[in-house]
């Protein structure tokens, strides 16, 4: 039984990678996915490193209630700096780039054609409260799939 992706990809022109069971926010993952889709791997890695450094924010077009406005986003106002999810996305892109290089493609120039996070479940946790009680304080577990395509193969 192999790993199933949500879309079909031509193995001759694409490289794939997937993050499995990562404790990152699904909402942050969705925002990052929308921001990096369509970019080359080099552009996306540079963008995510700027997000981690706090120089560039990720636009939150969905799940943006109470999210502060950022002046560095063109055409949108709400944005954040999802540090933890950005680090995991960098690992995903590095893995996908290396898979593309192994297939004989130029890894940094490959285009991100598909990136999709999926909620897998929750890891149970407890938060202590007053009078000896405890409340559920669960952590979201996500899978993220990524497909890169060789730009010369689409021409």
Segments (PLM) and residue ranges:
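Ribosome large-subunit tunnel/peptidyl-transferase-proximal elements
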Residues: 2-106, 147-148
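Low-complexity, polar-biased intrinsically disordered regions enriched in Pro/Ser/Thr/Gly
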Residues: 72-78, 124-132
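Extended, charged amphipathic interaction segments
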Residues: 107-130
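C-terminal edge-of-domain segments
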Residues: 132-155
